[in-house]
């Protein structure tokens, strides 16, 4: 051991360990993307990924001792990734600039934990891209339920020609506009501040207590705001889009309604779909049924009961 230590400096040893973690993390990610992993392998990959972030300097506020603790089995999985860091301040309603491994996002004080989770799900788990259902170069993408724009950022990195972001929350929409100001100016991103629904009109929209995510509220809710509702078929016509290649949809249980408002789009353009199916108990049945009613030629597969993919 003494001979080994004298030959390999501590810095080189750390580098070798880091390379081993990166290789192992890459192998885990490869298996995940090819549906060859169980939940345990997914968790192992996320642990290794955190050390990779530390080696790359992405989490400078976390010490090496703390980073090593977080990869241990005793550390709660959902609390392992404290990767969103507040690095700047700005005007309301988006007073915090967050730095994440996916880039910088304007948001509120509440958004740190949500950005942690979204980074974990999307940068490591690829929850919206599996097998043939992925964003391709020059795609036109609909990001339905855009939130602060994490998937919009991923789609742009994949080479999407245009991303249409649909987001009803006025605070999220304002933060999104600030984050993607340059991309909006050069025409690669367009924001539609509305809720996707089966028909145009207005809806009652209620925010969560701990974050800026929200959902369509029931008639009895007294704390909801009124937001504009759009049918995606109508929106496509209004924007004069000649194609849509990929739709990501995560809208807190309103997915079946939004898909019903996109029947013509699904029937004539057949975009690849990544749809959340865990918000309502019957989503795993109702969402695929809505897609098949619009276009019976879709092939589909699911992932752990959370996501459905159509192509």
Which residues does each predicted region cover?
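Phosphate/nucleotide-binding beta-alpha loop and adjacent structural elements of enzyme active sites
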Residues: 1-311
């Amino acid at each position: 051991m003494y001979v080994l230590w004298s030959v390999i400096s501590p810095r080189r040893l750390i580098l070798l360990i880091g390379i081993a973690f990166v290789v192992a993390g890459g192998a885990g990610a490869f298996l995940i993307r090819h549906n060859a992993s169980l939940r345990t392998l997914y968790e192992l990959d996320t642990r290794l990924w955190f050390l990779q972030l530390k080696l790359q300097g992405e989490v400078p506020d976390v010490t090496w001792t703390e980073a090593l603790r977080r990869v241990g089995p005793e550390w709660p999985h959902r609390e392992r990734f404290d990767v969103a860091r507040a690095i700047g301040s700005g005007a309301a309603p988006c007073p915090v600039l967050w730095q994440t491994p996916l880039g910088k996002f304007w948001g509120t004080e509440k958004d740190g934990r949500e950005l942690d989770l979204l980074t974990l799900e999307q940068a490591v788990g690829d929850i919206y891209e599996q097998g043939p259902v992925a964003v391709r170069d020059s795609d036109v993408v609909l990001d339905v339920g855009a939130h602060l724009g994490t998937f919009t950022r991923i789609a742009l990195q994949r080479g999407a020609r245009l991303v249409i972001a649909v987001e009803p929350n006025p605070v999220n929409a304002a933060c999104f506009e600030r984050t993607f100001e340059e991309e909006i100016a050069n025409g690669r991103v367009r924001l539609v501040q509305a809720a996707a629904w089966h028909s145009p009109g207005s809806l009652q929209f209620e925010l969560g207590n701990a974050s800026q995510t929200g959902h369509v509220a029931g008639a009895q809710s007294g704390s909801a705001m009124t937001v504009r509702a759009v049918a995606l078929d109508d929106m496509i016509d209004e924007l004069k889009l000649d194609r849509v290649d990929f739709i990501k949809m995560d809208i807190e249980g309103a997915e079946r309604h939004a898909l019903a408002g996109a029947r013509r789009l699904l029937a004539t353009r057949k975009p690849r779909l990544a749809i959340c199916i865990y918000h309502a108990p019957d989503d795993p049945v109702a969402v695929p049924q809505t897609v098949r009613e619009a276009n019976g030629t879709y092939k589909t597969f699911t992932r752990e009961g959370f996501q459905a993919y159509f192509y």
